[in-house]
């Protein structure tokens, strides 16, 4: 961690003293962190993320990392001259593409994220949702209105899945050994088929199954914004549902807040959508009064 980020030695000491009550509050707790977006592609932010996760472990918190990798998948598909096809804004994942998705997510990206944490002094182990039967998946069901017939029809997205069941035993085995699990969101179906799973959905489901104290969702926006584009610091699940209904929450933020609501309804104490572009975003959220993102409670 670059001490220049925190000013003088006196300022660093003041920051640590201020953080102590929050460290005590979360000691022994499980925190699931969804990592992706711009923070993953920026070298300096990536190093800071690794340091943040290592520090969480050092002060007695049990971090569990779930990562995305959309840009890296896109890059590999281009290199292999595999054309992406989208239906209603969702990528269709055929048999050839799901092999690439698994190779990139469970291989290149997974080991890169684990490496960031290991270089910061902690011990991280990269796995995917297929390992130990962690993420049991089912085919994602989506429908859309046909523009010609105006009839609702099922969309065939190929091997795009969603979590059906989370078996947390492999996570407990790793955390019990003092290791930090780094999880690629690739799941296994009942038929043995590999499924590509949205990282937000995987993180929310894993946090719920673990009964995590916090779910941190790193994004490329400050959090949930109101109609004046100002950050909403805290929302209840009911507030979120009302915000979707009245149009305050729109677009790509809807599935993110829905994952958070689902997680808190499954027992997570709080889910936070925060800006991963902010240096040391995880530490600022966990160890400062009020945090920096939008906290969603049940």
UniProtKB/Swiss-Prot annotation:
Pathway: Amino-acid biosynthesis; L-arginine biosynthesis; N(2)-acetyl-L-ornithine from L-glutamate: step 2/4
NAD as UniProt keyword: no
Subcellular location: Cytoplasm
Transition state stabilizer (site feature) positions: 34, 256
Coiled-coil zones: none
Domain of life: Bacteria
Annotated catalysed reactions: N-acetyl-L-glutamate + ATP = N-acetyl-L-glutamyl 5-phosphate + ADP
GO cellular component, one term: cytoplasm
MF terms (GO), sorted A to Z: acetylglutamate kinase activity; ATP binding
InterPro entries in the cross-refs: AceGlu_kinase-like_sf, AcgluKinase_fam, ArgB, Asp/Glu/Uridylate_kinase, Glu/AcGlu_kinase, NAGK-C
Keywords, comma-separated and alphabetical: Amino-acid biosynthesis, Arginine biosynthesis, ATP-binding, Cytoplasm, Kinase, Nucleotide-binding, Transferase
SUPFAM superfamilies, per database record: Carbamate kinase-like (SSF53633)
Record CDD domains: AAK_NAGK-C
Keyword Lyase: no
Pfam families on file: AA_kinase
Biological-process GO terms, alphabetical: arginine biosynthetic process via ornithine; L-arginine biosynthetic process
EC number of this enzyme: 2.7.2.8
Binding site for substrate: 69-70, 91, 196
Family: Belongs to the acetylglutamate kinase family. ArgB subfamily.
Protein's UniProt name: Acetylglutamate kinase
Source organism of the structure: Granulibacter bethesdensis (strain ATCC BAA-1260 / CGDNIH1)
Gene designation per UniProt: argB
């Amino acid at each position: 961690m670059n001490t220049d980020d925190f000013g003088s030695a006196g300022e660093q000491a003041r920051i640590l003293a201020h953080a102590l009550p929050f460290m005590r509050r979360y000691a022994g707790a499980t925190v699931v962190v969804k990592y992706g977006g711009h923070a993953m592609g920026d070298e300096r932010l990536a190093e800071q993320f690794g340091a943040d996760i290592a520090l969480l472990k050092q002060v007695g918190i049990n971090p569990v990392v779930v990562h995305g990798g959309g840009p890296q998948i896109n890059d590999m598909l281009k290199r292999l001259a595999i054309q992406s096809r989208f239906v209603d804004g969702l990528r269709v994942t055929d048999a050839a593409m799901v092999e690439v998705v698994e190779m990139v997510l469970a291989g290149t990206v997974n080991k890169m994220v684990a490496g960031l944490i290991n270089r910061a002094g902690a011990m991280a182990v990269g796995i995917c949702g297929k390992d130990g039967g962690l993420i049991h998946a089912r085919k994602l069901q989506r429908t859309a209105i046909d523009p010609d017939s105006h009839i609702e029809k099922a969309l065939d997205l190929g091997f795009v899945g969603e979590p059906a069941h989370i078996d947390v035993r492999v996570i407990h085995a790793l955390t019990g050994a003092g290791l930090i699990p780094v999880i690629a969101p690739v799941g296994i179906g009942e038929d043995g088929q590999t499924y590509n799973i949205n990282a937000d959905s995987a993180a929310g489901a894993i946090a719920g199954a673990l009964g995590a104290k916090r779910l941190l969702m790193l994004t490329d926006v400050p959090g949930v914004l109101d109609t004046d584009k100002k950050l909403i610091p805290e929302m209840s699940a009911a507030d979120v549902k009302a915000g979707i209904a009245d149009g305050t929450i729109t677009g790509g933020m809807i599935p993110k807040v829905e994952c958070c609501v689902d997680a808190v309804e499954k027992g997570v104490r709080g889910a936070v959508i925060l800006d991963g572009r902010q240096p040391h975003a995880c530490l600022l959220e966990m160890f400062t009064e009020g945090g920096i993102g939008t906290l969603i409670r049940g």
